[in-house]
């Protein structure tokens, strides 16, 4: 076929395949069998391979993936992608309605939409062609994920009119795709995704676009961010226009004239939640009129004209099949409920937390009981109660053992503690869990050394002490399951890099009782190096800000042990850094930062900056981080899904910032 004929045929195939895509993925009404679609796609790819210069940016062939990216570029949003304020009950909705009416009067209509549990994205079109897609990021700056978004077949690569427009939507993984993906991951002995939202986010942040293309993602577009020339006067009109242009919008939407009508609709939608083929975590209520939206405006972190009603934690009933015991790195014995598989909050749950023996006794939890399992968002499922009236007589009381399930040493209960402990320092489970803790993100942060690899290394007797990690060789690692040459090289590089970590990471990784990451940082900063710390007396430790008696006793006891001193000498000889190399906090009187001398609480999920990095940056400018909100708190920085701490800050009239404002202050 000559070039001119190829060009004409490619244009025809574009039109045909775009129509097939629209019918199948947007209208859910395919007009041809899959085999016909596949044949036309193969024809297009073949022609584009023959004539590479005829391959257009909006070609349907872009949906199969193939490009491998080096990194995601930053994208600044022309119109910020702000998060929404939350409503958790009927009173919150009535308060929202009252605020709206006080501002713009009683002539109000609300547009009610499902809150899809996925990843918020922005899609930019120039002259009708999809040119850029980005994540929300911190609301001001996101990441360019255009190539991965092109693999979502419900995103039109070319819309039905040559408009320049930016739209917002929620990319998600449908429930059937999520279940199939996790089943495949389990077959490959890979860690399953916790929920469809994590799976969608992970898929769209793959540098290899072929992986994203295989994940069967979908999208609902829910708003127009920027559009010239065409007059749209309401949210509902905007959604109708999006439909006309070929975007996929959610049809479970309605315009309500009163807040009471909204509340009634929410109750109806709650009952349908399990029937949707995608996860929802709430309902979004928006003032329908765009003129009224403009009049209401924004707070620092969210629009005043919209609110997200969040569903309460989901509860289901299932059978308790067994109670499994595990041994943590400090010897604590933790019971876990083994359940008859049940769907809760979007995932299949087979295990749930029982916390400790006292909870089992308090709730009179018995084997084979019908139990209530509760899960909200990403939290670990927990057994919230028992249906005693459904007992049949086959249920059996559960008794905690007197011996460690791993090493069979006698278990003890330390005075004042709820938990049973194994106090055998040679207990294999404690050693293994200690190694897992040592390499974890907040400790030595050795990338590639997760629980699976550590368990293998321990089982093969290649490591039994943390110092053994620094003696591992390529020859030893290459013999492990699913460890290729490249993986081994990356792992050895990561182990070597961890030697340069600042002292606080090592201290936290060693697992000294009562010393969390914050206390480890405080001690490292105060003493400067391990030699000064291990010689410190209890009195000297108590002089350190925020170090209490239990912590001081634990540190002194830890460094009195000969085996610990030998371990530290080994690590030093192996090249592990033993000094504090992190930023030194600015003295309050020397800092002109807003944070200097203030007590600050971080709450919710930060999108742009890791929480630990944000803490370190604030502390370096003289700020003091606190874990809870009180009258002494000067500032609360609220990220996504901030909860009770934000509510308390509002009650106490404490200043509240979002992540965007925090980043602006840090950049000064």
From Swiss-Prot:
Keyword Kinase carried by entry: no
Gene3D superfamilies named in the record: 5' to 3' exonuclease, C-terminal subdomain, 6.20.10.30, BRCT domain, DNA ligase/mRNA capping enzyme, Helix hairpin bin, Nucleic acid-binding proteins
Residues involved in NAD(+) binding: 34-38, 83-84, 113, 136, 170, 286, 310
GO process terms (BP): DNA repair; DNA replication
Catalytic residues as annotated in Swiss-Prot or TrEMBL: 115 (n6-amp-lysine intermediate)
Residue ranges occupied by any BRCT domain in the UniProt entry: 590-668
GO cellular component, one term: cytosol
PROSITE patterns recorded: BRCT, DNA_LIGASE_N1, DNA_LIGASE_N2
Reaction catalysis annotation: NAD(+) + (deoxyribonucleotide)n-3'-hydroxyl + 5'-phospho-(deoxyribonucleotide)m = (deoxyribonucleotide)n+m + AMP + beta-nicotinamide D-nucleotide
Keyword NAD included in the entry's annotation: yes
SUPFAM superfamilies per the UniProt record, alphabetical: BRCT domain, DNA ligase/mRNA capping enzyme, catalytic domain, Nucleic acid-binding proteins, RuvA domain 2-like
The enzyme's E.C. designation: 6.5.1.2
Cofactor: Mg(2+); Mn(2+)
One Gene Ontology molecular-function label: metal ion binding
Keywords: DNA damage, DNA repair, DNA replication, Ligase, Magnesium, Manganese, Metal-binding, NAD, Zinc
Superkingdom per UniProt: Bacteria
Binding-site residues for Zn(2+), renumbered to this chain: 404, 407, 422, 427
InterPro entries in the record: BRCT_dom, BRCT_dom_sf, DisA/LigA_HHH, DNA_ligase, DNA_ligase_AS, DNA_ligase_CS, DNAligase_adenylation, DNAligase_N
A Pfam family per the record: DNA_ligase_ZBD
Function: DNA ligase that catalyzes the formation of phosphodiester linkages between 5'-phosphoryl and 3'-hydroxyl groups in double-stranded DNA using NAD as a coenzyme and as the energy source for the reaction. It is essential for DNA replication and repair of damaged DNA.
Annotated family: Belongs to the NAD-dependent DNA ligase family. LigA subfamily.
Cross-referenced PANTHER family: CHROMOSOME TRANSMISSION FIDELITY FACTOR 18, DNA LIGASE
Protein name (Swiss-Prot/TrEMBL): DNA ligase
Taxonomic lineage: Bacteria, Bacillati, Bacillota, Bacilli, Bacillales
